[in-house]
Curated annotation (Swiss-Prot):
It comes from the Eukaryota. NCBIfam families: BchI-ChlI. GO terms for cellular component: chloroplast. The magnesium chelatase complex is a heterotrimer consisting of subunits CHLI, CHLD and CHLH. The gene is chlI. Redox regulation; active in reducing conditions, inactive in oxidizing conditions. Thioredoxins f and m mediate the reversible reductive activation of oxidized CHLI. ATP binds at G50, D51, R52, G53, T54, G55, K56, S57. This is Magnesium-chelatase subunit ChlI. Its EC number is 6.6.1.1. Disulfide bonds join C285-C327. It comes from Mesostigma viride. GO terms for biological process: chlorophyll biosynthetic process; photosynthesis. Pathway: Porphyrin-containing compound metabolism; chlorophyll biosynthesis.
Length: 360
């Protein structure tokens, strides 16, 4: 066995078990936002803001066990999809066009971490100019965006990340492609990923124009109920003492949610949303003075994803109610004189437009 294989095996054995997603108590808003983005990546990612120590990173990393498998081209640094031209590299597309055989394997969707101090080259990848000039080849060293293609890119403390890098991430997530240009040489590759950011609002907010680019915005608050706090602490202690036994207890519930997600991804295209509901969604966005049409689009997508997750082929008003705050709270203009928070404002407008009585 080679030294590299030995290191890989040791690393694999030392990998810390992940806390089960279904064992996380509370924080339903954050969990729902993550699941819906896995069902429909076109929702546009999620920004999770909340107090320190509320389980933001734990929940995001716990998602890895629920992610379905995808088919990728073997030994391809971009996780190319052998069937979708928008998700394959130029090299793979050329092989397919030339009727060459392209071997594939099944692999789990990956979560890629973007460190806070990452440089633009580390994120986007680099071109070896010397090799390009001397040998006439596009020697490209892929970055994190290549690794994240068809997966999830997680940025902790995204509000502390350089604005320029946030722009690059959002542009790539929206367009699905990353282009690197150096000294007149250009390389592009697919970079379609779900962008998940988390942060503490005390450490600074994202600029509104960047915030608007995230499909959803979840707000996480510290649990106040003493009984619930005790339960969370006890569960965490049990996991730390014996992760394998703890994970075993949640095996079935994990498998159930994973199956639900896989089925929802398959059925998503069949979910219908009545025109009347779409008109009411746009009316809410209009009356709340939401800039642009991103809000309307994301609500429609998220409502369909929720209906698919719950095993239905038709969107109901309750689906819209459940996701509308996640989709709009970060798109409202902030008025320092208003005492009502943006989430409550969105819900009140929903009840007003749909002609329903507010739930106490």
């Amino acid at each position: 066995m080679s030294t590299i294989d030995l290191i890989k095996n040791v690393t694999k054995r030392e990998e810390r078990p992940v806390y089960p997603f279904t064992a996380i108590v509370g924080q339903e808003e954050m969990k729902l936002a993550l699941i819906l983005n896995v069902i429909d990546p076109d929702i546009g990612g999620v920004m999770i803001m909340g107090d320190r120590g509320t389980g933001k990173s734990t929940t995001i990393r716990a998602l890895v066990d629920l992610l379905p498998e995808i088919e990728v081209v073997t030994n391809d640094p971009f996780n190319s999809d052998p069937r979708d031209p928008d998700l394959m590299s130029d090299e793979v597309r050329e092989k397919i066009n030339n009727k060459q055989e392209v071997p594939t394997i099944k692999t789990k969707i990956k979560i890629v971490d973007l460190p806070l101090g990452a440089t633009e080259d580390r994120v986007c990848g680099t071109i070896d100019i010397e090799r390009a000039l001397n040998e006439g080849v596009k020697a490209f060293e892929p970055g994190l965006l290549a690794k994240a293609n068809r997966g999830i890119l997680y940025v902790d403390e995204v509000n502390l990340l350089d604005d320029h890098l946030v722009d690059i991430l959002l542009d790539s997530a929206a367009s699905g492609w990353n282009t690197v240009e150096r000294e007149g040489i250009s390389v592009r590759h697919p970079a379609k990923f779900i962008l998940v950011g988390s942060g503490n609002p005390e450490e600074g907010e994202l600029r509104p124009q960047l915030l608007d680019r995230f499909g959803m915005h979840a707000e996480i608050r510290t649990v106040k109920d003493p009984d619930l706090r005790v339960k969370i602490v006890e569960e965490r202690s049990s996991f730390d003492e014996n992760p394998q036994v703890f994970r075993k207890a949640y095996e079935q519930s994990q498998e159930d949610v994973k199956s639900q997600i896989i089925q929802a991804r398959k059925n998503l295209a069949n979910v219908q949303m009545d025109r009347e509901l779409r008109i009411k969604v746009s009316q809410i966005c209009s009356e709340l003075d939401v800039d642009g049409l991103r809000g309307d689009l994301v609500i429609n997508r998220a409502a369909k994803a929720l209906a698919a997750f719950e095993g239905r082929d038709k969107v109901l008003p309750k689906d819209i109610l459940k996701i509308i705050t996640l989709c709009l709270r970060h798109r409202l203009r902030k008025d320092p004189l208003e005492s009502i928070d943006s989430g409550s404002k969105v819900e009140s407008k929903f009840y007003e437009v749909f002609g329903l009585l507010e739930e106490n």
